[in-house]
Amino acid sequence: MNLGRLCRLLKPALLCGALAAPGLAGTMCASRDDWRCARSMHEFSAKDIDGHMVNLDKYRGFVCIVTNVASQUGKTEVNYTQLVDLHARYAECGVRILAFPCNQFGKQEPGSNEKIKEFAAGYNVKFDMFSKICVNGDDAHPLWKWMKIQPKGKGILGNAIKWNFTKFLIDKNGCVVKRYGPMEEPLVIEKDLPHYF
């Protein structure tokens, strides 16, 4: 029996356990591979740029753009500028942007979360910034592991994130509907947004 099927079979029992014994629920399914059981982005959590844990279920009903960011990349200015523009024009329509700093590509995000937050403020960022993470390898954040194996989240020449500013479009149900490579500027996503409002 594969892990995905096992998770689907056990999920109702785990949910009942969580309802009956909330203190125990966090320890019942805490293996490194829990992310494989997820059916949507809404089943994950991540620390925001200030270190507070955020349940991504808060994005249920919103169309989301999830991206890895870096402050010292050659693509930083165009990506931050266009992400800020998209947020300004589409936030009222229900679009949310989730930016995850990452230092795995050319060590182009070396600063602390505090420094990254200051940098983003220089672009007048109003979208959600998260704490620095890894997006590839064993230490990758579970959300990123999950997005990369989704049918519409797979990459070209393998599923690994290739560089800064890889973007995922997530529908209102928390499912990956498209992946955009690092060379694709954020405004490319604009043409796809109306399909998911």
Swiss-Prot record:
One of its GO terms (molecular function) is phospholipid-hydroperoxide glutathione peroxidase activity. One of its GO terms (cellular component) is mitochondrion. Its EC number is 1.11.1.12, 1.11.1.9. The active site is at U73. It comes from the Eukaryota. Gene3D superfamilies: Glutaredoxin. The keyword Mitochondrion applies. InterPro entries: Glutathione_peroxidase, GPX_AS, GPX_CS, Thioredoxin-like_sf. GO terms for biological process: arachidonate metabolic process; lipoxygenase pathway; negative regulation of ferroptosis; response to oxidative stress; spermatogenesis. It is an enzyme of class 1 (oxidoreductase). Expressed very intensively in the testis and weakly in lung, heart, and cerebellum. The keyword Mitochondrion applies. Keywords: Cytoplasm, Developmental protein, Lipid metabolism, Mitochondrion, Oxidoreductase, Peroxidase, Phosphoprotein, Selenocysteine, Transit peptide. Monomer. Has a tendency to form higher mass oligomers. Interacts with FUNDC1; this interaction promotes GPX4 recruitment into mitochondria through TOM/TIM complex where it is degraded by mitophagy. Essential antioxidant peroxidase that directly reduces phospholipid hydroperoxide even if they are incorporated in membranes and lipoproteins. Can also reduce fatty acid hydroperoxide, cholesterol hydroperoxide and thymine hydroperoxide. Plays a key role in protecting cells from oxidative damage by preventing membrane lipid peroxidation. Required to prevent cells from ferroptosis, a non-apoptotic cell death resulting from an iron-dependent accumulation of lipid reactive oxygen species. This is Phospholipid hydroperoxide glutathione peroxidase. It comes from Macaca fuscata fuscata (Japanese macaque). The lineage of its organism: Eukaryota, Metazoa, Chordata, Craniata, Vertebrata. The gene is GPX4.
